[in-house]
Amino acid sequence: MIKPKKSLGQNFLIDNNILNKIIKLTEIRNNNIVEIGPGKGNLTQKIIEHKPKNLILIEKDQTLVGNLKNDLKKYNNLEIFNEDILKFELEEKINKDSIVIGNLPYNISSQILVKLINFKIWLPKYKRLILMFQK
């Protein structure tokens, strides 16, 4: 069993009620989805069930990336990046039709939000942000 790493501010989203609420807020079918910090992939699985056009996962924890790659290898519309979202080159992967979803690590949630807001200022870079902030 994988336990959250406090050093990364991890808190895995496992509540089905919350997962379903996030999915209801998001038009996933045939859209480009970017998930920040997929963790163990609970939200990712729900996203996949709703048939996105493309799905990009950005996860810093190498152990979790290995598990995600193994668990999701049958999906060909999926890219997984083992990177820190604060250093990730959003411009190369996100387009104006993307929907960004994230259950943000509590220790860097403000920095991620600022990065996404600054990224949007110059041109429309994504369609919508659906973010959850942990306490």
Which ranges hold each PLM region?
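Catalytic cores of RNA-modifying enzymes
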Residues: 1-135
